[in-house]
Amino acid sequence: IMAGVPAISLEKHLARIIAEQKYTVVLIKQKGIPPNVTRYLDTVVSPGTNFDFVLDQDENNITSLLIDQIRGIYLVGYSAIDVTTGKCYYNEVHGTSEDKFFALDEVFNYMNMHKTNEIIVSFADKNINQKEVLDYLELSLKTFHIGHFRPKISYQNELFKNVFNIQSLLTSIEHLDMERVPLSTESLAVLIDFVIGHDSNIIQKLSHPQKLDVSRYIYLGNNALEQLNVIETTHN
């Protein structure tokens, strides 16, 4: 879809479009004085990388998941950036022989605890049943992309060094205390690379990644807040 709007009303229209959670908007601006006018790519705005054009001030997380499996048991590296504040989170979860879907359940909970508007899903094993994972995480209800970028350790270290301004004798991954969570470091590298490709300004305010402390939360599933009449439903 191509559209043009008066410059004075750009923010209003763009906020409404992004709020639909369906579209990635490419902003083409022009510079110069007619007839010597040139057009250039200014910004790429997607649901997860939007922080300038918002209808409310709620958190807006873009999330990256790296999914692996061992003998049918799922392992997930999770990372997320709240583009409104620059806060960065990560965790790595492994399933068990008793519950092979445990890791998927955990990241599903993470995405419900932290308002998630866009997701990049990467698969470490080509034999993973991708449809099973996407359906289990109910990603058809969100904006998501299948990622194919698999950054090497050397790339991750250099990327983190530049983004987080790390000056240390340790590797960047060690400095961030993430050497024991390789799925999470790769997930975070994929996420940062994606964000830079959309709007590099977001990276300038990025804080050091924090391990997600799930012990601070209780997850209320199955629309529990609505069922308990804590919040109103749209049809009430």
Give a label for each model feature:
Residues 1-236:
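Charged catalytic and DNA/RNA-contacting regions of genome-maintenance
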